[in-house]
Amino acid sequence: MSRLHNYGLFQLIFAVSLGAWLTGCATATVATSDIGVLDPQLPIIPLATPFPIRTIETLDKKTNKRIETDVLAMKSSEIRKRLTTYESFTTIQKRDTSGGLTYIGNSAKIGKGTYIITFDYVNSTVQEISFNGRAKPALGQIGVGLRITAEVTTLTNDVEIGGLIPLGIAFNDRKVNGNLRFKAFGLSNDKVASLIPVDKQVLDVSGIQKAFEAAATVRLLIGLDETTLEPHLIGVTGVSVSESQSALDAAKSKLSKSP
């Protein structure tokens, strides 16, 4: 497929395919000043793979207190009412020469290298997670949605890769190459397998468009009565990178226990 030469066309694809998701949706970003900080606090530290949880907080109407309820005992309509926030999270990690990954901020242009970019489009809520005797708990981000993972190699310096549109523009300008992977999580519907790409997609105009279409599709499927929902732990917020693994472990332990 030929490369696009018009930013306006990317905007059109974005508006048509993903507008339904992002209307009223909060997007998590990182300030430029966080770039290069040894231990930044990012909007979210995602799990490598979203993890199915066993319990979710609900309100006991008899006692007017929050209790842990087994998600399998809840109807999908009840779960849907708990996942009240539509959000998109973007996190970027840089791969070093030894294969290790380091989190960086996502609102500034970056230099040559290989990067893993995680885009989470989710219906979600949060639950407090206590860990390591910390006075202020972390927040476990739980929900259902779509994860798009881009593995990108930048071919020049000063490339913006903190979003699907910037990635498409960078591809158009021959500044990046790479691939995209898709994972719908926390929802069961016969249409998922046929509408969400299973195979790795090349990072090109077609791949970017499929990403938008997949996000819009999942957003619609979440709202359908016939879709079964099972919330997953997506990641943790309110912690620094150095604390994140302890917080993630505590979240997995708490949310996988029987109520």
Residue ranges of predicted features:
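Short flexible linkers and secondary-structure junctions
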Residues: T97-K109
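Membrane pore-forming effector domains from diverse proteins
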Residues: A28-Q93, K109-P259
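Compositionally biased, intrinsically disordered low-complexity regions enriched in proline and serine
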Residues: N6-G8, L22, E213, L233
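Bacterial N-terminal signal peptides that target proteins for export
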Residues: S2-I13
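Bacterial N-terminal signal peptides
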Residues: Q11-W21
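Generic detector of short, well-ordered, non-transmembrane alpha-helical segments enriched
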Residues: W21, I104-N106, I165
